[in-house]
Amino acid sequence: MTRSLKKGPFVDHHLVAKADKAVTNKDKKPIKTWSRRSMILPEFIGLTIAVHNGKQHVPVYITDQMVGHKLGEFALTRTFKGHPADKKVVRK
């Protein structure tokens, strides 16, 4: 279910403030955030945001195709190791 258009996009205020500061200072360091729920705005294009996945911060470089998506979509929280292989006995 998508968010209502009359509400507009949700972005944490501290993330917007950090992004504006990075743009004005032309800072290339990643911006650390735990806000996976924040939507990517056009002002974030070209920035690297380190999104927390529950264990570590995953660096995400923001491109124009990511605008409108949420930050959490690009930092996976679960690791899939694959299904266990069949352990069949090989007789010689």
Curated annotation (Swiss-Prot):
InterPro entries for the chain: Ribosomal_uS19, Ribosomal_uS19_bac-type, Ribosomal_uS19_CS, Ribosomal_uS19_SF
Entry keyword annotation includes Ribosomal protein: yes
Keyword Glycoprotein set for record: no
Domain of life the protein comes from: Bacteria
SUPFAM superfamilies: Ribosomal protein S19
Keywords tagged on the record: Ribonucleoprotein, Ribosomal protein, RNA-binding, rRNA-binding
Stretches assigned to coiled coil: none
Any single biological process term in GO: translation
MF GO annotations: rRNA binding; structural constituent of ribosome
Cellular component terms (Gene Ontology): cytoplasm; small ribosomal subunit
Function according to Swiss-Prot or TrEMBL: Protein S19 forms a complex with S13 that binds strongly to the 16S ribosomal RNA.
Assigned protein family: Belongs to the universal ribosomal protein uS19 family.
Protein name in the entry: Small ribosomal subunit protein uS19
Source organism: Polaromonas naphthalenivorans (strain CJ2)
Organismal lineage: Bacteria, Pseudomonadati, Pseudomonadota, Betaproteobacteria, Burkholderiales
